[in-house]
């Protein structure tokens, strides 16, 4: 419900020790051959290139436009995808970091819709790293990809596989050492959910302190609560 006020089913949310374990879980799930590719932005957060290498996949770069405030250039994205396919690479997923890391840009809704259309057209899992959603300093507001998906056609809304990632390490809280986070799945099939459950079970469960932090952040003080004035001041 934190993602744009859209209803969330408990079975579609997994608590993790920060965002990184969830990201690595999905990359591990998607990559089973050296010709399995994952599209990642350049510049990027090094976790993605390292994890793709760790799991034996192929990194497929797409380049952000520095001249256009580090926006995603869809012509460049299509070119990168085509070049990868021509080399025999089976592209499985598309990673987007919004707000950007390390670039800091916030994507417009129009740009997000184009990415959603691209992923749907090419049957790619859209992995949206949204851990910096509360570190916004410009004029463009943050829109969750889950909310952007809701603006699309019924066919795309029901057909695109989307996974979003959240962490207590960022935002105004910045609790890096607590290791709390979660990922949320949209349109993931039952068979795939079974595999995700198995992979997640290997780690038993996320740590309790991190879980507590997630609960406090998603159920933060609301207007009218006794603690709200102090919360607003410190935020």
Tell me what each language-model feature is.
Residues 1-118, 127, 133-155, 164:
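Conserved core of the PLP fold type I
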Residues 23, 49, 88, 128, ...:
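Internal amphipathic alpha-helical segments of the cytochrome P450 catalytic fold
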Residues 54, 147-235:
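Conserved core segment of the aminotransferase class I/II
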Residues 119-120, 160:
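Residue-level detector of transmembrane insertion/anchoring sites
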């Amino acid at each position: 419900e934190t993602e744009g006020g859209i209803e969330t089913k408990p079975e579609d949310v997994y608590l993790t020790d920060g965002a990184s374990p969830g990201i690595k879980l999905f990359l591990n799930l998607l990559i089973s051959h050296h010709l399995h590719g994952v599209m990642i932005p350049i510049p990027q957060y090094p976790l993605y290139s390292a994890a793709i290498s760790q799991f034996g996949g192929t990194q497929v770069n797409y380049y952000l436009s520095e001249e256009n405030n580090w926006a995603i250039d869809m012509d460049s994205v299509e070119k990168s995808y085509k070049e990868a396919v021509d080399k025999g690479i089976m592209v499985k997923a598309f990673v987007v970091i919004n707000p950007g890391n390390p670039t800091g840009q916030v994507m417009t809704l129009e740009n997000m819709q184009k990415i959603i259309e691209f992923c749907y057209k090419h049957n790619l899992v859209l992995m949206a790293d949204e851990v910096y959603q509360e570190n916004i300093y410009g004029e463009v507001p943050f829109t969750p990809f889950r909310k952007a998906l809701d603006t699309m056609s019924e066919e795309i809304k029901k057909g695109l596989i989307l996974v979003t990632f959240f962490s207590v390490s960022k935002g105004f809280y910045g609790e890096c050492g607590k290791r709390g986070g979660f990922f949320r799945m949209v349109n993931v099939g039952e068979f795939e959910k079974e595999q995700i459950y198995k992979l997640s079970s290997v780690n038993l469960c996320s740590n309790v302190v991190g879980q507590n932090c997630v609960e406090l952040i998603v159920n933060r003080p609301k207007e009218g609560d006794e603690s709200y004035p102090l919360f607003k001041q410190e935020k």
